[in-house]
Amino acid sequence: FDYLDDKVGLYDTLRNVACGYESAASITHCWQSLNGIEKKMLNFLENHDEQRIASDFFAGDPRKGIPALIVSACMNTNPMMIYFGQEFGEPGMDSEGFSGRDGRTTIFDYWSIDSIRRWRNGGKFDGKMLNEDHKRLYEIYQRVLTLCNEELAIAKGVFFDLMYANQNGWRFNEHKQYTFMRKYKNELLFIIVNFDSQLVDVAINVPSHAFDFLQIPQMESYQAVDLLTGAKEEISLLPYKATEVSVRGYNGKILKIAF
């Protein structure tokens, strides 16, 4: 094996955060505990051993996994695994022969799953049998994974966790939101995810150490592009003034700034 599944650390933590059992601030400890071996870890949210995100045994809604997807795929340079049907919100709630109805997709029976059958559409592989929720989720997965390969700040860049500067924030809930930066040469990605169901207007503190470590200039106004939607917005990057951002429920933003 070239990579080790990050199960006990990142997977378990993201699952608990997505289900509301643990604070998003706990994600910081996951990367800290790796002690430099993060490049050898395989990040995932579903596999043959674990229950599907959309199953009744996990989150019950595939949208709740979107913030976890963004974190897992974008926080380091290591690979991210997507299990078949995950990108369509496969619930894994079939009553399969040996495994039964346990929120997993059986590895012991000859079986096919509904989301993949819909995507195959009788061998046409055009996805026309997928419903609108499936298609929207697939677009998000496709976009995030494409960014992992196209954006050098994700593929090669350095990482800076902003959570320590946002504890007990008056407009930032560290239990429901997580934020960090990725940087490569003159490109900065400001990433914020929201594990809450509601839209939030957050104010994020960027500490002086971030400017020094990432070697980024202070500016009252930057034009940033959300790489998930293509939308442009003006944000400030100053150590003495919080950066204000709105994030939809069960979603996130990957704001790109070029210097």
Regions inferred by a protein language model and the residue ranges of each:
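Active-site-proximal helices and loops of the catalytic beta/alpha 8
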Residues: 1-41, 62, 89-147, 152, ...
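Active-site clefts of carbohydrate-active enzymes
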Residues: 37-60
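Structural recognition of the beta-strand scaffold that forms the well-ordered cores
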Residues: 42-44, 74, 80-84, 191
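Conserved, mostly hydrophobic/aromatic
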Residues: 48, 72, 85-87, 144, ...
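Active-site beta-strand termini and strand-to-loop segments that position acidic
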Residues: 180-186, 257
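Short, well-ordered beta-strand segments enriched in hydrophobic/aromatic residues
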Residues: 188-195
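Solvent-exposed beta-strand/loop surfaces of large extracellular or lumenal domains
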Residues: 220-241
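C-terminal beta-strand-rich structural cap/linker in extracellular carbohydrate-active enzymes
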Residues: 235-259
